[in-house]
A protein has these predicted regions:
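Membrane-embedded alpha-helical bundles of multi-pass transporters/translocases
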Residues: 1-168
Length: 168
């Protein structure tokens, strides 16, 4: 159950990226829809690297002797880095600054890219760790449970973000 919490965080990040920031950028900041769609699609560019991340976490041991956990840490740090850059990129996109607009677009694109890389890295290494720890006869149930927890994270965070942002 504790190992499934990374899937909840992945679900929350997906809702934050695809739902909340999408609406904020289009409605409040009046960023062109095609540009927002491109930024929302940026995290998917890291999807093909999941096989490489999985292979690397299968074969490479870190300095501490761990295989999966450093990838989960790195993915979490990438997610955090992207979400840390995002508010500043949105401030520049709002037009209340003296800098050129392309800096805000580049910052938002970088933030979306970092979050996407973190999502895929965390999810791939976490699923691999769960299958390593689970007995062979229960692996399908463990993977199914992890995906259910991802959906729980998506639904729960959508309800929470919706309630918190109701006045906006």
């Amino acid at each position: 159950l504790r190992l499934s919490l990374f899937q909840v965080s992945v679900g929350m990040a997906v809702v934050l990226l695809n739902g909340t920031l999408n609406r904020v950028m289009i409605v409040e900041l009046e960023v062109p829809t095609w540009l927002v769609a491109l930024m929302v699609a940026l995290p998917l560019t890291f999807a093909p690297f999941r096989a490489l991340i999985g292979f690397r976490s299968d074969t490479h041991r870190s300095v501490l002797g761990w295989r999966r956990v450093p990838y989960i840490w790195m993915g979490t740090l990438l997610q955090f880095g992207g979400f840390a850059i995002m508010p500043f990129a949105l401030l520049v996109l709002s037009g209340d600054t003296h800098g050129p607009a392309w800096i805000g677009h580049a910052g938002a694109a970088l933030a979306f890219l970092l979050v996407g890389a973190g999502l895929h890295t965390t999810q791939t290494a976490g699923l691999a760790l769960a299958t390593d720890l689970a007995p062979e006869h229960s692996r399908p149930r463990v993977v199914a449970f992890l995906y259910v927890m991802s959906l729980v994270g998506m639904v729960g965070s959508a309800l929470a973000f919706g309630a918190l942002l109701e006045n906006f």
